[in-house]
Each structure stands twice: as structure tokens, then as C-alpha cells.
């Protein structure tokens, strides 16, 4: 299973003041806070760790169908600047991140899905939410169809009762785990192949 998350750094700077009293305490473990405060770029590290938590949470949700908000129960560990792990209730997830011009993008996966997925992060052509969602859906369907040599017209995305997107070939649910994300001017997808 896989999950992803991204942060538009300009929008995050407008929406969240990570330096305000209590922000770090509410979202990050003491080890994570130490990592942030000792970092050469604390702002980047805050959003890197956050995207690791969110992407791993999406995998956990697909596996356990159990929603919760307890960010400190998601413990991040950076192995390299762009690779790490997240531990959630004794389940270990691996992450790979891209720190780009204006964004941080992370994909989380279980060990057996490492390097077995398509992933793409892109800048939107418009700022309208509905158009952004449509553009993201079109991109994931086109990439999946191209990889598997399927006609894209037969593929569709529907959300289940938990709001998790699922991929269909006609009326048949496909077992390929995938995840969509967008924030501000950026969108991304990852899908098992």
C-alpha cells in the first residue's frame, strides 16, 4: 500500500505559523522537535516531517480503515534528508521525499511496495479546487493506463465510504493502492503498478 502528501511552502507560510506557542508540541514528538530545532532549515524540516506523517497516515488508513487525529502517535525518523520511516501503532512505513522549488512531496509505502509505484508531482494550471481535482484524476488515470497499456476511457476513480479513492476498470474494483494529494498550486499522485 502507498500514500502521499505534499505541502505548498508559500501557502503553508500563509496558513500556519509553526513558531507560535504550542504548534510544535501539538504535532511533533520531542525527538522530532529536536530534529526541527537543530536543522539548518527548520521551516523545511517542519513541513518535511508533516508530509511524512500525512503520507504514512494515508497508508495506515487504507490498511485499518480507522481515522484519528493524533499526530504525535505518528513518529518520524529521518534516515537521509529525503528518506525516512514513520511508526504508527507498531506499523512501520517507509518514506521518500522530494524537496522542490516551492513544495515538499512525500510518498509512504510498506516495505514490499518499495520502488513498485508510479509517482508524479506537478504544478496546477489553475487555482480552482474542482479543476485541480479533475486535473489530478486525469493525470493518474492517464499514467496508469499508459503503464498497463489500457484504454483510459475504461478507468475511473470513485471514493469509498471513508473518502478513500479507489480505482475501477469499468465496474470492477482494482486492487492497486493509490493516493492523491494537492495543496495550493501543486498536485501529485502515486499508484501501485
Q: Model features per residue range: what roles?
A:
Residues 1-193:
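Core catalytic alpha/beta fold that binds nucleotide/phospho-ligands
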Amino acid at each position: 500500500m502507498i500514500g502521499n502528501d505534499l505541502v505548498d511552502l508559500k501557502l503553508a507560510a500563509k496558513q500556519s505559523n509553526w513558531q507560535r506557542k504550542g504548534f510544535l508540541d501539538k504535532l511533533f514528538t520531542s525527538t522530532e522537535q529536536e530534529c526541527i530545532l537543530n536543522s539548518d532549515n527548520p521551516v523545511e524540516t517542519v513541513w518535511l516531517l508533516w508530509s511524512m506523517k500525512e503520507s504514512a497516515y494515508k497508508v495506515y488508513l487504507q490498511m485499518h480503515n480507522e481515522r484519528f487525529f493524533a499526530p504525535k502517535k505518528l513518529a518520524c525518523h529521518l534516515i537521509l534528508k529525503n528518506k525516512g520511516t514513520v511508526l504508527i501503532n507498531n506499523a512501520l512505513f517507509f518514506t521518500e521525499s522530494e524537496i522542490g522549488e516551492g513544495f515538499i512531496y512525500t510518498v509512504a509505502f510498506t516495505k514490499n511496495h518499495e520502488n513498485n509505484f508510479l509517482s508524479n508531482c506537478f504544478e496546477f494550471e489553475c487555482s480552482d479546487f474542482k479543476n485541480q481535482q479533475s486535473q489530478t484524476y486525469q493525470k493518474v488515470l492517464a499514467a496508469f493506463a499508459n503503464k498497463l497499456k489500457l484504454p483510459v476511457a475504461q478507468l475511473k476513480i470513485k471514493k469509498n465510504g471513508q473518502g478513500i479513492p479507489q480505482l475501477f476498470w469499468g465496474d470492477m474494483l482494482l486492487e492497486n493502492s493509490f493516493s492523491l494529494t494537492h495543496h495550493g498550486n501543486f498536485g501529485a499522485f502515486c499508484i501501485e503498478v
